[in-house]
């Protein structure tokens, strides 16, 4: 029964990938088996945005055009992108028509569009963008359109270059998320039980693997009826965040631009052993019938933490707005007590320009507008208002979330474990998920991290060698 719940959760999280694998805050409602073109929703009453007094340098003038976007959400109305779109539309005379599909449909739809000569002009970055899709020559290099020395890209060249393919830059992420996944908890229940607030522990530099483990134990032990559980959530992403806290990514980009596997690294092994301890001691588990995106265990105070993408926090914020007695909050994954620094997973989000696009120059200007929504003081303030209206964050939530957008203040770990071919990426997801949670997989049931890794390492290394051979 746990397998069924977790597998359903894995499906749910993959369908929400446009929300939680990138910028983390998008309100996508698309699924893998449905699609729609455009939208009839008019959100001007709910979220009016004015950019008339803002002046930006997002690039030289371009010919007005209607750009085609293929992805998971309406980028003309999403709270964190709408101000950038309005500026782009009003000052460059361009519009964007959105074809909204589920994340699992993007590769198929993009392949069909390119082969038929009807390439869109913008497409979402996804887990399989690099290196899988990039290696298929399905994107347009943006080096001639983008100025990496422009102020909005200051300090980001090292991260942009992590996604170079054969010496060319196809991807200029406009959103950089240190700690794209958080541990959400019911702060009100923690206070009732008498537990230390994890946010305060984090602020004091005391939020470590050990203090998290101690907190979970105390949370579970506080219920004499045995109805409280510990950690649940997005299985593989939660496991990856713990591994990345050692400072060692599972798959990284070497100085020569080639992929490097760290699955056999001693620090990765140590993190995996820590996760197996959490699992074996019952500190990481799913309640019966619960999947990763379920919020009921946190709302009812029956689970200590939910490891989930930033996107889910908005749902908790909206509950708090309706009932001011509720108090939910979140912290990043804890620090590895043996690491020399506090290391955080980092994810990026942005758009790529598909091969065959007729409006690559206009698309590049829009990407610049999106990045400026994070760096230009006026557009950033307008974007904050837009986000607050659409997401309903408290001021405390917003300020804490935004603190993780400035990657230069953190020791960020760039990790790309899911960008290989579909089969290998799923193997990695399964191994990570089964290391931290008992998923009752026929293939991995009862196996240790070492056993699962050794059984999979040949497949993983073969794929890495394949991609490196293309470079």
Give the positions of each predicted feature:
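Extracytoplasmic/periplasmic solute-binding protein
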Residues: 165-176, 181, 191, 208-260
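Hinge/lid segment of periplasmic solute-binding proteins
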Residues: 41-63, 127-180, 210, 331
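Extracytoplasmic/periplasmic substrate-recognition and gating elements
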Residues: 96, 320-387
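Glycine-centered hinge/linker elements that transmit conformational signals in sensory
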Residues: 214-216, 255-289
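C-terminal motif of bacterial Sec signal peptides marking the signal peptidase cleavage site
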Residues: 14-17
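Extracytoplasmic "Venus flytrap"/periplasmic binding protein-like
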Residues: 86-156, 169, 192-193, 297, ...
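Conserved C-terminal helix/tail region of periplasmic/extracytoplasmic solute-binding proteins
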Residues: 38-45, 360, 374-471
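A structural signal for short loop-to-beta-strand junctions that line the ligand-binding cleft
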Residues: 112-113, 121, 125, 149-190, ...
């Amino acid at each position: 029964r746990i397998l069924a719940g977790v597998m359903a959760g894995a499906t749910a999280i993959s369908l929400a990938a446009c929300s939680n694998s990138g910028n983390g805050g998008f309100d996508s409602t698309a699924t893998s088996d449905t699609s729609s073109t455009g939208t009839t929703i008019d959100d001007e009453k709910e979220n009016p945005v004015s950019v008339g007094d803002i002046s930006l340098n997002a690039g030289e003038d371009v010919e007005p055009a209607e750009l085609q976007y293929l992805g998971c959400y309406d980028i003309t109305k999403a709270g964190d992108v709408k101000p950038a779109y309005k500026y782009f539309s009003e000052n460059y005379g361009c519009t964007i028509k959105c074809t909204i599909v589920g994340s699992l449909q993007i590769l198929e739809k993009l392949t069909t569009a390119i082969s038929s000569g009807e390439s869109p002009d913008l497409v979402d970055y996804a887990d399989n963008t690099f290196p899988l899709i990039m290696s298929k020559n399905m994107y347009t290099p943006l080096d001639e359109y983008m100025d990496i020395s422009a102020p909005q890209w200051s300090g980001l060249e090292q991260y942009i270059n992590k996604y170079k393919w054969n010496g060319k830059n196809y991807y200029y992420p406009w959103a950089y998320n240190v700690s794209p996944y958080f541990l959400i908890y019911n702060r009100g229940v923690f206070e009732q039980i008498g537990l230390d607030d994890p946010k305060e522990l984090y602020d004091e530099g005391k939020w470590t693997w050990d203090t998290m483990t101690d907190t979970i134990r105390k949370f579970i032990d506080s219920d004499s009826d045995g109805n409280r559980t510990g950690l649940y959530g997005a299985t593989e992403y939660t496991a990856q965040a713990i591994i990345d806290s050692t400072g060692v990514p599972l798959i990284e980009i070497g100085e020569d631009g080639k992929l490097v596997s760290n699955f056999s690294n001693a620090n990765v092994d140590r993190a995996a052993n820590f996760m197996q301890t959490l699992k074996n001691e019952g500190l990481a588990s799913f309640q019966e019938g619960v999947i990763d995106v379920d919020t009921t265990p946190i709302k009812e105070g029956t689970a200590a933490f939910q490891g989930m993408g930033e996107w889910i926090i908005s749902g908790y914020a909206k509950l708090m707005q309706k009932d001011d007695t509720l108090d939910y909050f979140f912290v990043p994954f804890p620090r590895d007590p043996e690491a020399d620094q506090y290391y955080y997973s980092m994810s990026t989000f942005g758009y790529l320009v598909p091969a065959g696009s007729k409006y690559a120059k206009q698309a590049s200007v829009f990407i610049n507008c999106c990045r400026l929504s994070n760096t230009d003081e006026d557009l950033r303030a307008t974007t904050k208002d837009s986000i607050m209206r659409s997401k309903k964050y408290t001021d405390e939530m917003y300020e804490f979330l935004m603190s993780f957008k400035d990657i230069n203040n953190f020791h960020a770990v760039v990790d790309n474990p899911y960008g290989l071919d579909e089969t290998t990426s799923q193997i990695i997801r399964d191994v990570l998920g089964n290391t931290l949670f008992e998923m009752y997989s026929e293939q991995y049931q009862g196996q240790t991290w070492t056993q699962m890794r050794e059984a999979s390492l040949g497949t993983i290394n073969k794929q890495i060698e394949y991609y490196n051979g293309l470079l």
